[in-house]
Amino acid sequence: MENMEKVVYLDNAATTACAPEVLAVMVEALSGACGNPSSHYSVGYEAKEFVDAGRAQVAKAINASPAEIFFTGCGSEADNWAVKGSAFTKARQNKKHLITSAFEHHAIMHSMAALERLGFEVTYIKPTAEGYIRPEDVEAAIRPDTALVSIMMANNEIGTIQPINEIAAIAHKHGVWMHTDAVQAVGAIPVDVKELGVDMLSMSAHKFNGPKGMGALYCKKGVWPQNLIDGGSQEARHRAGTENVAGIAGMGKALEIATTHLGERMAHEQQLRDYVIDRILKNIPEARLNGGVEHRLPGNVNISFPGLEGETILLDLDMHGICASTGSACNSDSLDPSHVLLSIGVPEEIGHGSMRFTFGPQNTMEEAKYLCDVLEEVIPRRRAMSCMWLQGQNKARQFSLKGEQ
């Protein structure tokens, strides 16, 4: 088997390359709009036009008003602002209880932990074995002092999509604010804040072929989480700091492109996803898919290969020119098992052998087939050298022999 001549990038959940049209508008903003968008003269007005245009594009993509879009430095900042800002606002009403899931992104998990250290209480909802949050479990956890429910729209590791509209309706029935981390969803599947019924929604530009270091928080009119960054009057006095004009322009353009061709993109990515899942589960013994298929991001594949370490597979794939991951890029330096996989009941030893492959619009069926070719060669070869795999096979044979006696 020969390596492909180009790098095969299959880690689109970690980040994506800027689209050419995005780079073009960013260069235009950087070179032609040198003023401060808060300044009241012509050069400042030119910069503000880029900010206003980007805000309008983001708002249109999720069916919001431009006045409901607040730009941040990243998706993690948007998550921190939604969670901590809501907690601090509601604490003034003696509401110091929050609800989230046990498999959120670390931006949510660590924000919740920080609030717990300040005396807040947090309930962590356990997902089902297929990776879904049951709305009835959320309702059962709501208390009179509940300030916020924060459940991610789509999981960043296993790609499962949550029933956010049902959960939001339950939260509102009890007078509770609802936030969703939609960083993996925006630009990948349809996102309509009115249909979802959420009060706050986080997004990140580099997940949909926009620039890194650029995010946004949607806040429904009348919902104001307390500021985390104080200073000037930018972002309607809710998030201080001179705006990243080029970043905002790039984010708006990227989301406009992503949502314009969303149906085609989803169908294409799902075709690649399903091909890889079907072929790997058929041809590699004991490979297991993590997360359900019915409500799953179209480009997400997360598969465990028992008897191996994910880092070993990762190195082999890299030698064949394939970029993938063992889980969230935000936690890639840790050798601890994925909290996402543990939360859905994947045993620790199997979770260590999990790989995430995430497709984007630029990927091809040729690349999907090449990935399967490489895995079908690498996994058996590595297992033949794996003490963990061989010991497991010996135990299985011994159990089988005992059953025949």
Where are the regions that the model predicts?
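Pyridoxal 5′-phosphate
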Residues: M1-Q405
